[in-house]
A protein has these predicted regions:
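Intrinsically disordered, low-complexity regulatory regions
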Residues: 1-98
Length: 98
């Protein structure tokens, strides 16, 4: 984490959330398949690399963590905020069995 980092979290505009929703309900599914299926596959790869079981839910949490770490260096980077919102949406889809 950068020294004396100050992160100001501003109100997230609705358009950012709408963008994340469009991505996970549109191109994301077309490009990567159903949310749960894709994240279970990622978990299998990570499990092999790490030598311990990883769940699809842990993949989502870790990806959010990656985006949060990047925001420590560039807190206004819009794409990271969209991605975080998208991963929250992906987790919601997984909960619904999508």
């Amino acid at each position: 984490m950068p020294e004396e980092s100050t992160i100001t979290i501003k109100a997230m505009p609705a358009c950012l959330l709408e963008e994340a929703q469009r991505i996970i309900n549109g191109t994301r599914k077309t490009d990567y398949g159903p949310a749960r299926e894709n994240h279970e596959l990622i978990a299998q790869f990570w499990s092999a690399v790490l030598g311990k079981p990883v769940t699809a839910e842990q993949v989502v949490l870790c990806m959010i963590g990656v985006k949060m770490a990047r925001l420590c260096y560039s807190p206004e980077h819009r794409d990271s905020w969209v991605d975080i919102a998208g991963y929250v949406g992906v987790k919601s889809k997984m909960n619904r069995g999508e």
